[in-house]
Amino acid sequence: MKIRKELIAQRDPKSPISEVFRTLRTNIQFMNSSKKLKTLLITSTFPGEGKSWVSSNLAVTFAQAGNRVILIDADMRKGRQYTIFGAAPKPGLSNCLAEMEMTNQNDWDISRYIQKTEVENLLLIPAGSIPPNPSELLVSEQMMKLLNDLKEVCDLIIIDGTPCELVT
């Protein structure tokens, strides 16, 4: 499988940009040395500022260090992680949360929504179908349950969030 140009940390691990991501990873780990960081949200003010690029490369860098990482594309209107990783766009986060809402939360199967990537230790949950209510889904009881369940099976969850200016 072809390594995507956006995944500089995977494509060119000795580049200066990859070193910046490793430094960022180390700084995040150092800041949280007293307690284990499990969830990291990457966002921006406006679209096009590079949050998806930062999220994907930071996820790769944590995975390269041996951490089991799940990258969640929570930008349900304009999610790009599936294109960055060459994955299927759905089912994804919105589909998962909708299923959880309609069924008993203990009866759903998260594995249907998690996709492997070509990066060892890195899994992806793409944004999925565009829902009518993305903001409500992100703060829902189902989202909290999903995050709590995922924390049990990985070392770190990186969330590629929505630009703050667009959230209502």
Predicted regions mapped to residue ranges:
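P-loop NTP-binding module
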Residues: 1-168
